[in-house]
A protein has these predicted regions:
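An anion/pyrophosphate-binding glycine-rich loop and adjacent beta-alpha core
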Residues: 1-50
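Glycine- and aromatic-enriched mobile tails/lids
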Residues: 4-10, 60, 66-80, 84-128, ...
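Hydrophobic alpha-helical scaffolding
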Residues: 19-30, 52, 64, 93, ...
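Short, glycine-/Ser/Thr-/acidic-enriched flexible segments
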Residues: 24-26, 59-60, 66, 72, ...
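FAD/FMN-dependent oxidoreductases across multiple families
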Residues: 35-78
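Glycine-rich beta-strand-to-loop/alpha-helix junction loops that act as flexible
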Residues: 81, 341-342, 362-368, 386-388
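Acidic/glycine-rich phosphate/pyrophosphate-binding loops and surrounding catalytic core
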Residues: 123-321, 326-334, 338, 347, ...
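Short, charged, intrinsically disordered terminal tails
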Residues: 388-410
């Protein structure tokens, strides 16, 4: 209809068309459109006796502003819902007449997306940076710069101030901007990074995320290491968000595991939190998790739980990994606080959950991915852990482009 109106206006060389309300009937017009009747009367039009000139509002031409799953537009931090939004639920030709229920659903998603930035984990503090982060970044830089960057030294013999742009090449969730900046700062404290995004933001293909200014030699030497961190962390955050969104209508807490890249755990677990997941254990001192080999070493589930309580009485909770129904029964009898159901069939999961009957918290684990999490998310458990959040997430494609000298070249 909007297209037909637009074509008619083009044909008539006018900025309006005529709408005839008379076939509706006076009583119905007065009942349903009292404000239109009053407004037209003020302008000298009698809707009961003549057609009136009209033009569709801009969003009717557009079919609404295009939004994503969370009602987010292409403009940073701008959301659109209802008649202003084109969400694609009913196809690309759907105009702005979104239903109330549809609007409520997308409003809820928008609200949840807005609050994520306030729930995002804090960045690394100065102490953490100095003691835990900087040594890892410096080690990574030494992999690339053992003595000199021969390529850069070949074309840049002297210092020259320059600028390069951080460009997003695919849609995703950005994470690790502080580490990206820190990588350059460890090479040269005078490097300046101006960000146009924050950790946890949705970013889109072609979007400018940052401008980095400094000695061009430093920018060239540090770009690969800085991008490696940022791409890896953003990839994990993006995949975690995908999985977390599948659990949005549940109370389940999504957990990561210790299946991380050696020497990169601090970065990868931070990225999981940015994506909406939670950290399980950061390291072996964070809690008791009795797995199959611990149980084998102890002799039984019962002995393992008792030995753990005797050795670490201050530990708040003891978790036990089980693989069979007999192990489930033994873990419950032993007083395990959390029971991890590992690599179980759907039938065995249901049987085990029914048997536990809230006598312990329940975690499901074992090859859980975005593709199969729907199989277990409605079983009434407390946690779902997924090693895939860190070991199977692909990088987010990002690039440093358009390096150029500032104020000419010496």
């Amino acid at each position: 209809m909007a297209e037909a109106i637009f074509k008619q206006m083009e044909k008539d060389q006018t900025d309006y068309v005529y709408e005839d309300l008379r076939p509706i009937g006076k009583e119905e017009i007065e009942s349903h459109f009292p404000h239109i009747v009053e407004h037209c009367k003020e302008k000298g039009y009698d809707v009961f006796k003549e057609p009136i000139p009209v033009v569709p509002a801009q969003h009717y031409f557009m079919g609404g502003i295009k939004v994503d799953y969370d009602s987010h537009t292409s403009m940073k931090h701008l959301y659109a819902i209802g008649e202003t939004a084109c969400n694609g639920v009913h196809g690309k030709n759907r105009l702005a007449s979104n239903s109330l229920l549809e609007s409520l659903v997308f409003a809820k998603r928008a609200a949840k997306d807005m609050t994520r930035k306030y729930e995002a984990p804090s960045m690394f503090d100065k102490t953490t940076l100095k003691l835990n982060v900087d040594p890892l970044i410096l080690s990574a830089l030494r992999e690339d710069i053992t003595s000199e960057d021969v390529s850069t030294c070949s074309v840049m013999r002297t210092a020259q101030l320059g600028e390069v742009e951080l460009i997003c090449k695919e849609n995703g969730i950005i994470a690790g901007l502080q580490i990206f900046e820190r990588t350059f700062k460890l090479l040269d404290e005078d490097v300046d990074v101006h960000f146009f995004a924050h950790d946890g933001d949705k970013v889109h293909k072609g979007e400018l995320l940052a401008k980095v200014t400094g000695d061009m030699r430093t920018l060239l030497e540090g770009e690969r290491t800085a991008l490696n961190y940022l791409q890896r962390m953003s990839g994990i955050a993006t995949y975690t968000r995908k999985v977390a969104d599948l659990l949005e209508d549940t109370d389940i807490k999504l957990l990561d595991t210790r299946k991380t890249t050696p020497n990169n755990r601090i970065f990868e677990k931070y990225a999981v939190k940015v994506g909406g997941g939670s950290n399980h254990r950061y390291n072996l001192t964070d809690g008791v998790l009795l797995k199959d080999n611990h149980i084998g070493a102890a002799g039984s589930v019962t002995k393992a739980v008792q030995m753990a309580r005797d050795y670490a009485p201050s530990v708040r909770k003891i978790e036990v990994e089980v693989e069979t129904f007999d192990m489930v029964k033994e873990a419950v009898a032993a007083g395990a606080d959390i029971i991890m159901l590992d690599n179980m069939s759907t039938e065995l999961l249901k049987q085990s959950i029914d048997y536990i009957d809230k006598r312990a918290e329940i975690e499901i684990s074992g090859n859980v991915t975005a593709e199969n999490i729907n199989r277990v998310k409605d079983m009434g458990v407390d946690f779902i852990s997924s090693g895939a959040l860190t070991h199977s997430a692909k990088i987010l494609d990002l690039s440093l482009k358009n390096l150029h000298a500032i104020n000419g070249r010496d």
